[in-house]
Amino acid sequence: TVLGKAGIKVSELCFGILPMGPLQADISVKEGAKVILEGLKSGINFLDTAQAYNTYLHINEALKDYSGEVVIASKSHATEYDEMKEAGLEACREMKRDYIDIFHLHAAKEDKNVFKKRSGALACLVDLKKEGVIRAVGISTHAVEVVVQAAGVEEIDIIFPIINKVGLGIIGGTPEDMIEAIKKAHQAAKGLYAMKALGGGYLIKQIEESINYVREINEIDSTA
C-alpha cells in the first residue's frame, strides 16, 4: 500500500514501538529488538516511533540483523526550528539511518492552532525534507479538527490520526466524525495511517473486530 502523494510503500500493518519503551512496558533494548525483528520477518515493513518514546536504540539493534526494506516514522514535540532540526538529526544518528522516512509534528492533544504555534518546527521539517534528512512531513493527532486543518496544509504529506471502533482517545468528535475528517484528508492526497486501532490495548479482547473496523476505512493506508 502507498501513503498518499508521498508515494512511500508500506505494509498494511504498522508496528507501533511506544509500548516497549520506558513510558510503558520498559523492556530492554535486546528484548525489544527481538520483538521488532519478529514483526519485520512476518512481513511488517513499517515502524512508528517518536523522540519521546526512547526506543531508537531498540530499532537500531533490530535492524543490525535485518537487511530488508524498512520504513520508519518518528515524531517530536519540538516547537522551534532548531529544536526540531536536532530531533531529526538525533533520529538519524541513533537509528543509524541516512534519512527518516516520515517525521511528524507530535501533536496528540493539541488543537487546530498547532500549525501557528509550531510554525518554526514545521518550517524545519520542510527544510529537512528538501535536504534529504526526511522523506515526508507529517502530523500525529487525536483531534478531529486538526485532521481537517491538516488536509488544507500544503506542507503536510502524511497524517497519523487516532481512530478505533469505540472512539477511545478521539478529541472533538465521534469515530464517524474522525472518518469524515480522514476522507477530507484523503481527498487532499494526504497519506493516512491509523493510530491506536486497539485503543491503546483496551480492545485487546476484540482484536479481529477492531482491526477490521479500521481496515474497512478505505482512506486508511496502514494500521498501527
Residue positions per predicted region:
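Active-site groove signature of glycoside hydrolases
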Residues: 92-113
